[in-house]
């Protein structure tokens, strides 16, 4: 079915198609015809961060920034859905156009800039959702006009407001589309920010009587030395997990493409190699007690299996869905299942 819808979506501007696709998804969900888009994969239970996931294939943050489509997205077969990135106050993001397909390379360039309706709107949407399946992650960020020295206040505001509703929370310090945000990945800044957030997490755990896991999402453009430094800090502060990686500002393999000069983060197939290299390096430098989610460039089941081989416990999709549609979810689940069941695969990272 998606093969029939895709040409119509690709005739539209990428951001308009994004909205149209989500509206079509909701319509199919409400009318009971979502099964025509993709069949739900058989369960492949996976344990991570103290949570039980129906399967290890999730939706990455960015597709549903405000949590308006949670139930429909779960119905596509994802084991978990991550919504956001959300900020304390609503913000419009960067000027349009700000989203570009690169079909020749199965890539997408975006400079959205954390456009979202604000954390209060997201909280209301989450409360209105049925949430009768899967694990819900909420990705939090800072407003663009909040200076880095006060960034912790934005993250703590979001952490507190979403804590009771999230199954896990992701701290996004790696988007290239908010000026200066990636500076928070530098060793000292990272230590200061995550220390404050860990304190907030423990305070909220005591208040709510439950501990919600907190993950940190990192960039693929970190040098090896910076990856090592980040790993030291995140291990020292005992974060619950790491997501590797966000989009890249590099244009490897498409340097001469007409869109290569567009500012923003590149996702999809072009980021697969570097993202997986960062994932692999993190796995060798973090204790096994800190699971990794591999995201970046997954356009096939083989790509998902490659992330698992590099040390991921689970994976996330986004740009691959643009080109492959919802069938990619089941394909990735089955590829990971085959890898897990293969005698040579050893013990899966759980």
Curated annotation (Swiss-Prot):
Known cofactor(s)? FMN
Can you tell me which residues form the catalytic site? Answer: 175
* Protein name (database record): Dihydroorotate dehydrogenase (quinone)
Q: How is the cofactor bound?
A: Binds 1 FMN per subunit.
Gene Ontology terms describing biological process: 'de novo' pyrimidine nucleobase biosynthetic process; 'de novo' UMP biosynthetic process
Catalyses which reaction(s): (S)-dihydroorotate + a quinone = orotate + a quinol
Known CDD domains for this protein? DHOD_2_like
How would you summarize the oligomeric state and partners of this protein? Monomer.
- Membrane topology classification: Peripheral membrane protein
Q: Where does substrate bind?
A: 65, 110-114, 172, 177, 246-247
Give the superkingdom in one word. Answer: Bacteria
What GO terms are given for molecular function? dihydroorotate dehydrogenase (quinone) activity
Name its cellular compartments.
Cell membrane
What are the EC numbers?
1.3.5.2
Question: What's a single GO CC term here?
Answer: cytoplasm
PANTHER family attached here? DIHYDROOROTATE DEHYDROGENASE (QUINONE), MITOCHONDRIAL, DIHYDROOROTATE DEHYDROGENASE (QUINONE), MITOCHONDRIAL-RELATED
The opening ranks of the lineage are: Bacteria, Pseudomonadati, Pseudomonadota, Gammaproteobacteria, Pseudomonadales
* The keyword Nucleotide-binding is annotated on this UniProt entry: no
Q: Give the main localization category.
A: membrane
Q: Which PROSITE patterns match?
A: DHODEHASE_1, DHODEHASE_2
Described by its record, this protein's role is as follows:
Catalyzes the conversion of dihydroorotate to orotate with quinone as electron acceptor.
- Residues engaged in binding FMN: 61-65, 85, 139, 172, 217, 245, 268, 297, 318-319
